[in-house]
């Protein structure tokens, strides 16, 4: 075997899992859950009693944290569900490009240029208007399961 036969795919993450298991019976309202491979925020949980043949079941109603779609799932309360690692990070807004991407300043001084402006009209208007007025804006970015989206805005004051 020569050295040339060893090719390894480089991945962006260091093997860190995008989700972790949690027993269905312990997931509460306002928690997070993966339904149909989408990260969701739980808005309603109801539990049914154990039947003649089976486990108690948890009925989850949840909203996709990126698309806002309502999803539902029913899981036996003793089974494990996938729970996404959801992070919120604040970045300072530096620039908005013509093609709808934002340029953000990270904590360590690098720029992050791979995020689009949000699709939410109210948030989009706040960002564009605030930037046009020259305000110092900090954007909250939510990330889960390899996806990122701008989800909030803070006005730090004039530049």
Swiss-Prot record:
PTM text: Lys-52 undergoes hypusination, a unique post-translational modification that consists in the addition of a butylamino group from spermidine to lysine side chain, leading to the formation of the unusual amino acid hypusine. eIF-5As are the only known proteins to undergo this modification, which is essential for their function.
Positions of region (Disordered): 1-23
Keyword annotations: Hypusine, Initiation factor, Protein biosynthesis
SUPFAM superfamilies: Nucleic acid-binding proteins (SSF50249), Translation proteins SH3-like domain (SSF50104)
Biased composition range(s): Basic and acidic residues: 1-12
UniProt entry tagged with the keyword Hydrolase: no
InterPro entries documented for this protein: IF5A-like (IPR001884), IF5A-like_N (IPR048670), NA-bd_OB-fold (IPR012340), Rib_uL2_dom2 (IPR014722), Trans_elong_IF5A_hypusine_site (IPR019769), Transl_elong_IF5A_C (IPR020189), Translation_prot_SH3-like_sf (IPR008991)
GO biological-process terms attached to the record: positive regulation of translational elongation; positive regulation of translational termination; translational elongation
UniProt KW Iron-sulfur keyword: no
Modified residues (Hypusine): 52
Single GO MF annotation: ribosome binding
Sequence similarity: Belongs to the eIF-5A family.
Functional summary from the UniProt entry: Translation factor that promotes translation elongation and termination, particularly upon ribosome stalling at specific amino acid sequence contexts. Binds between the exit (E) and peptidyl (P) site of the ribosome and promotes rescue of stalled ribosome: specifically required for efficient translation of polyproline-containing peptides as well as other motifs that stall the ribosome. Acts as a ribosome quality control (RQC) cofactor by joining the RQC complex to facilitate peptidyl transfer during CAT tailing step.
Record's protein name: Eukaryotic translation initiation factor 5A-1
Organism in which the protein naturally occurs: Nicotiana tabacum
